[in-house]
Design a protein with these regions (language model features):
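Cytosolic, membrane-interface loops and tails of multi-pass inner-membrane proteins
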Residues: 2-13, 70-91, 188-216
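Membrane-embedded alpha-helical segments that form the functional core of polytopic membrane enzymes
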Residues: 32-34, 38-72, 80, 121-132, ...
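Small-residue-rich segments of transmembrane alpha-helices in multi-pass membrane proteins
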Residues: 32-35, 84-85, 147-164, 213-214, ...
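Transmembrane alpha-helical segments that form the membrane-embedded catalytic/substrate-channel core
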Residues: 58-66, 129-135, 177-195, 227, ...
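Multi-pass membrane catalytic core of lipid/isoprenoid biosynthesis enzymes
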Residues: 80-121, 212-235
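Intramembrane alpha-helical segments
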Residues: 93, 97-164
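Hydrophobic alpha-helical transmembrane segments in multi-pass integral membrane proteins
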Residues: 158-168, 226-233, 281-297
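Interfacial loop-to-transmembrane junctions
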Residues: 255-284
Length: 297
């Protein structure tokens, strides 16, 4: 009896599986890049921020759930994904699809009802881009999957800006491109570490197609472009000293980490450090924008 109870407690619950489908760790960063632009644009009320957090989680969670539905065949072949709800047999594929669509539908209604139609449309566009353009098409066909598909993760700043201003201007587009150029080196660091897994699933990630050295060189170039892009608005007076110092320090640390990956013979630890720090980098960069605008401005 005791053994049965212990076994039941050790097995994932339905609630835990539903949360797993949404990929909450990934969503937390997306929410930072959604909310921060709102504070750069003005002073959003707590209710609007709450709506954006809830709606953003629902939309991104829905996209992630549908992603797991579409990737159920390759998830069974990869060690890091085979324990997900569908490949492990804990949930039916159709139930996961219905769950994902329901979350996205709820998010669309929430945005349209309590913000504006543009916000809902942009959020839904990000959903469709991630699900169909990236997951269904690019991921399985080209090593440029992350380069082009990275646009999906760059929609949240547009959504946050539109919720606050009702428009998408050059500032919002600038935020979009920061995330866009940040994405490839971030995911290529993971691809270097998990390339055998991707190989088993026949996913043409950059290290498998271009080779490790070329992937590392591409990571350096993308980081150089990213640094140049992050400091650009300072020359136009959009941000001040606080943001400039943050962008240079954070960008310098990230670039140094990527260069270190290319210099050491065993780059496993260095690649992990780049992958983890890149997450912190993006969050801190967007926070620095807010601090600069509210304190320095």
């Amino acid at each position: 009896m005791m053994g049965t109870v212990a076994e039941e407690r050790s097995q994932p619950s339905l609630v835990r599986d539903l949360v797993m489908l949404t990929k909450p760790r990934i969503i937390s960063l997306l929410l930072v890049t959604t909310v921060a632009p709102m504070f750069v644009a003005g002073n959003p009320g707590w209710l609007l921020v709450l709506i954006m957090i809830i709606g953003g989680y629902l939309m991104a969670g829905g996209a992630n759930a549908v992603n797991m539905y579409l990737d159920r065949d390759i998830d069974t072949r990869m060690s890091r994904t085979r324990l997900r709800p569908i490949p492990s047999g804990r949930m039916e594929a159709r139930a996961v699809l219905a769950f994902g669509v329901a979350l996205a539908t709820a998010a669309t209604f929430l945005f349209a009802r309590f913000t504006n139609v543009l916000t809902a449309a942009l959020a839904l566009a990000g959903f469709y881009f991630y699900v169909f353009v990236y997951t269904r098409w690019l991921k399985r066909t080209t090593p440029h999957n992350i380069v082009i598909g990275g646009a999906a993760g760059a929609f949240p700043p547009l959504v946050g800006w539109a919720a606050m201003t009702g428009t998408v201007d050059l500032t919002a587009v600038y935020f979009f491109f920061i995330v866009f150029y940040w994405t490839p080196p971030h995911f290529w660091a993971l691809a270097l570490l998990k390339q055998r897994d991707y190989g088993k699933a026949a996913i043409p990630m950059a290290p498998l197609v271009w080779g490790e050295r070329e992937t590392m060189r591409q990571m350096i170039w993308y980081n150089v472009i990213l640094i140049a892009l992050t400091v650009l608005p300072v020359s136009f007076g959009a941000f001040g000293t606080i943001y400039l110092a943050s962008a240079l320090v954070l960008g310098g640390i990230l670039l140094a980490g990527v260069i270190r990956v290319t210099l050491v013979s065993d780059w496993t630890r260095a690649a992990w450090q780049v992958y983890k720090f890149s997450l912190l980098y993006l969050a801190l960069l967007f926070v620095a924008m807010v601090v600069d605008r509210k304190v320095g401005g």
